[in-house]
């Protein structure tokens, strides 16, 4: 469990496809079924969003999914319960994407206890500044759960080195300035940014935000170690276009042989 399980997803040159699902969107049975599907389809890690009323980093698709979940009465405890149940059936690593507020409202010690029980391997907290990460970092380290760092295009390299120096799991490299969502293409400077991050950190680097096509996936995994696909996966799951998710996974894995 934990850090080692995430490491294994990148071993021997593996490229990681990390889909994002919103916890409780469509109900808990649907969450469990979607995790089972993604596991069987060959995803490397699954990222599960904790819905929050003020999701500052999320684009419209993920915001809508979070609102649907909250409007239907989804709770953090309910998401953990669903993960506890589905964990008995799947081995895929779980990474939670949560804003800081739900963690503190739930109680950080209680939150981490539930993470352990649900077999959560890593956590991403997009609104937790590096300077304040000890709010939960030391507690997570004690129980071998990775606190995944985010770095952005605007982060100076010194800051990237600082942010990632004590981190575990992988580095989440945000590939656009702004919020998540589907985009047509990526600017040339994104390539040099990813190459720069890769050359300065000792962890796998995963690109995320705005990745939505096979071409995007192929472009990104040529440079880095994997991709997170969020808004597009939510759209495809909503529209029952699961074959297209399998195609994105295949595009990722194809680059392992390259």
Curated annotation (Swiss-Prot):
Stored CDD domains: Tryptophan_synthase_alpha (cd04724)
Matching PROSITE patterns: TRP_SYNTHASE_ALPHA
Protein name: Tryptophan synthase alpha chain
Originating species: Bacillus cereus (strain B4264)
Gene3D superfamilies attached to this UniProt entry: Aldolase class I
Source species, domain of life: Bacteria
Annotated family: Belongs to the TrpA family.
Listed EC numbers: 4.2.1.20
């Amino acid at each position: 469990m934990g850090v080692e399980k995430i490491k294994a997803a990148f071993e021997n040159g593996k490229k990681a496809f990390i889909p994002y699902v919103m916890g409780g969107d469509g109900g808990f049975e649907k969450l469990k079924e979607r995790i089972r599907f993604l596991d069987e389809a060959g995803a490397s890690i699954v990222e599960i969003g904790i819905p929050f009323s003020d999701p500052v980093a999320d684009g419209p698709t993920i915001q809508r999914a979070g609102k649907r979940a909250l409007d239907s009465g989804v709770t953090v405890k309910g998401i953990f319960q669903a993960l506890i149940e589905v964990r008995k059936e799947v081995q895929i690593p779980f990474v939670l994407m949560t804003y800081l507020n739900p963690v503190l409202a739930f109680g950080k010690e209680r939150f981490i206890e539930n993470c352990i029980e649900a077999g959560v391997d890593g956590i991403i907290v997009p609104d937790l500044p590096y300077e304040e990460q000890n709010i939960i970092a030391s507690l997570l380290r004690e129980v071998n759960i990775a606190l995944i760092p985010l770095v952005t295009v605007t982060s100076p390299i010194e800051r990237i080195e600082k942010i990632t120096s004590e981190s575990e799991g992988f580095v989440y490299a945000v590939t656009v300035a702004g919020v998540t969502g589907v985009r047509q293409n990526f600017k040339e400077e994104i390539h040099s940014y990813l190459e720069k991050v890769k050359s300065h950190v000792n962890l796998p680097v995963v690109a995320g935000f705005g990745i939505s096509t096979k071409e995007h996936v192929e472009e990104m995994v040529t440079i880095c170690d994997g991709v997170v696909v969020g808004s597009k996966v939510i759209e495809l799951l909503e529209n029952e276009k699961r074959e297209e998710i399998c195609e994105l996974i295949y595009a990722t894995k194809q680059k392992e042989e390259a």
